[in-house]
Amino acid sequence: MKRGVLLNAPLSALVAQMGHTDEITVCDAGLPIPAGPERIDLALMAGTPNLQTVLKALLTDLVVEKVIMASEIKLISPDTHQALLDQIETHSLEQGKPIAIEYCLHEEFKTRSRQSKAIVRSGEITPYANLILCAGVAF
């Protein structure tokens, strides 16, 4: 049995395969998932697992240099936006490297998600609760 924190086999393999600047989209239950990227569907029911839980699991093993979010989250879901910013800031401190935050319109976000290595679907049902993690380097 794997000893680390991240026990989900597809997520663990995904993180192990990430190279510098590779991207993972972590999304809510409603984001359309295009053909192309690997689809890792973790949604069990509305709200389970939530986006923050999925993000927490991924961040146990992933070095992140940039996060991209839809700008609409700031106005439509400000509490979730702030919680994600807090979680990203905590990870930045833990990894000892800054994490840039970028925003784009939701339609641009959906287009950008096509270049992700994988799209990880959570059970999150908060509007615009999606992000793209851009991998950094561990050295």
UniProtKB/Swiss-Prot annotation:
Q: Locate the residues binding substrate.
A: 28, 106, 128-130
Where does the record place the catalytic residues? 20 (proton donor)
Query: Which Enzyme Commission number(s) are on file for it?
Result: 5.4.99.62
Q: In which pathway does it act?
A: Carbohydrate metabolism; D-ribose degradation; D-ribose 5-phosphate from beta-D-ribopyranose: step 1/2
One GO biological process term: D-ribose catabolic process
Alphabetized Pfam families for the sequence: RbsD_FucU
Q: Per its UniProt record, what InterPro entries does this chain match?
A: D-ribose_pyranase (IPR023064), RbsD-like_sf (IPR023750), RbsD_FucU (IPR007721)
The record's subcellular location field reads: Cytoplasm
User: Known catalysed reaction(s)?
Assistant: beta-D-ribopyranose = beta-D-ribofuranose
GO molecular-function terms, A-Z: D-ribose pyranase activity; intramolecular lyase activity; monosaccharide binding
Principal location class = cytoplasm
Q: Which UniProt key words apply to this protein?
A: Carbohydrate metabolism, Cytoplasm, Isomerase
Q: Name one GO cellular component term.
A: cytosol
- HAMAP family of this UniProt entry? D_rib_pyranase
Which NCBIfam families does the record associate with it? PRK11797.1
Subunit composition and interactions: Homodecamer.
The job of this chain, per UniProt, is described as: Catalyzes the interconversion of beta-pyran and beta-furan forms of D-ribose.
Record's family? Belongs to the RbsD / FucU family. RbsD subfamily.
| Name of the protein described by the UniProt record | D-ribose pyranase
